[in-house]
Each structure stands twice: as C-alpha cells, then as structure tokens.
A protein has these predicted regions:
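Residue-level signature of mid-helix packing/kink "hotspots" within the transmembrane helices
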Residues: 63-71, 155-156
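Juxtamembrane intracellular "pre-TM" segments in multi-pass secondary transporters
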Residues: 1-20, 204-205
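Intracellular juxtamembrane helix-capping segments at the cytosolic ends
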Residues: 122-135
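Helix-to-loop junctions at the C-terminal end of transmembrane segments
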Residues: 68-81, 166
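Paired small-residue
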Residues: 96, 107-115
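Short amphipathic helix-loop junctions that connect adjacent transmembrane helices
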Residues: 36-53
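Structural signature of the two symmetry-related core transmembrane helices
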Residues: 84-99
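Pair of pore-lining "gating" transmembrane helices in MFS-fold secondary transporters
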Residues: 13-34, 114
Length: 205
C-alpha cells in the first residue's frame, strides 16, 4: 500500500486537488461565518420575541434547502460537469450573501438563507464527485479523510472570521466579507479549471 505522500504524488492534478480541499474549507467558512452574530443581527432587524427560536429557524433553513436540492444538484453536475457546477454555485453563493446584507426583516433573511442552501447543495456533491474522479481507487478513503479535515477546519475558521469582521466593521460587513471569500475561491477555481471549461469531465488522465 502506498504511503500518504506517495498517494499524493501519484495524483496528476495536484493543483486541482488542493483547490478542492480549499473549496471544502471555504464551503464551511461561508456557511458558518454568520453563526456567532446571527441572534444579534436578527434582533437588529427588529425581532424582539422568540429571538433564539427565530435565529434557529434561519440557521436551519440552509440545511433544509440543502437536503431538498442536493440530489437534484448532483444530477445537474453529472449533466453539465461538476467543475462547472462548482463555479456557478460559488458565484451564486457570493451573490446571495450580498443580498443577505440588504435584508430588512428576519423573514427576508430566512428566505435568503434558504436560497443559499441550494448553493451548498451543489458545492458538496461537486467536490466529492471531482475528488472521486481524480483519486486512484486505492486512495479514495484517505483523500476523502483529508478533505474532511479541511471541511472541519472551515467550521473552525468561519465563526472566527465572522466574529472578527463584526468586531471591526459591523453586521453588514460580515456578509460582504463572506461574499468576498466565495468570489476569491471562484477566481482561484476558474484559474485551476481553465483547461476544462469546454469539457464536461475532469479526470485523472
């Protein structure tokens, strides 16, 4: 059995592999960046009663839409190419966060958070499918475990990023900063996928 280093060296598209790991981290960062400030932001939008319950519903809205649409997004990725779907989903997610900064009521924020979950439902299957295609069969479990490491790292960094932005710039800039992160990852992946934009599949060969 190959060592982890030998496995990584055997993968031809190492740059794309790193890009997918970083995208997994970004997915969690953009999903979790508003978690620390959400109850405060919901209160600033005018919610006084059942503040924690309403905040919880807004957080859950993303998970509900991801659950509803992830299967459909997986089929769409098979049809148009998972690398293309990743790019579209990152653009979509960044735009949704800009709209979240403009929300006037908790209801609007909840609807936008629900719509954001559709993008998450596209990102996660897309990354998994691409990793599966780029990785030798004997190394899939290890590569997926490394990908999970980056995903969980995003869950740590996202709330820290959101809290830091809030402390220095206020509520709205948490959303703008998160949108900027999504757009930055989009540009990075556009560079990595530049040779594959006209084809449907990205494969190891």
């Amino acid at each position: 059995q190959k060592s982890s280093w030998q496995l990584l060296m055997s993968i031809q598209q190492k740059d794309i592999l790193l890009g997918l790991f970083l995208t997994s981290m970004t997915i969690q960062m953009i999903a979790q960046s508003i978690s620390p400030i959400l109850p405060l932001y919901v209160r600033a939008l005018g919610q006084r009663d059942n503040l924690i319950f309403v905040s919880g519903m807004i957080v859950s809205a993303m998970g509900v839409s991801s659950m509803l649409f992830s299967g459909w997004m997986g089929k769409l990725g098979d049809r148009i190419g998972n690398h293309r779907l990743l790019l579209i989903a990152l653009l979509y997610s960044g735009c949704l966060y800009i709209l979240c900064a403009q929300a006037q009521t908790p209801l609007q924020l909840g609807i936008l958070r629900f719509l954001f979950g559709i993008g998450t439902g596209a990102l996660l299957p897309g990354v998994s499918a691409l990793l599966n295609r780029l990785t030798p069969p004997e190394g899939i479990s290890r590569i997926f475990s490394y990908n999970q490491l980056f995903y969980y790292l995003g869950g740590v960094l996202g709330p820290m990023m959101g809290s830091s932005i809030f402390m220095h710039f206020g509520y709205h800039w948490v959303f703008y900063g998160t949108a900027l992160l999504a757009f930055t990852d989009l540009i990075f992946l556009l560079f990595l996928f530049r040779k594959y934009l006209k084809v449907r599949d990205v494969r190891a060969n």
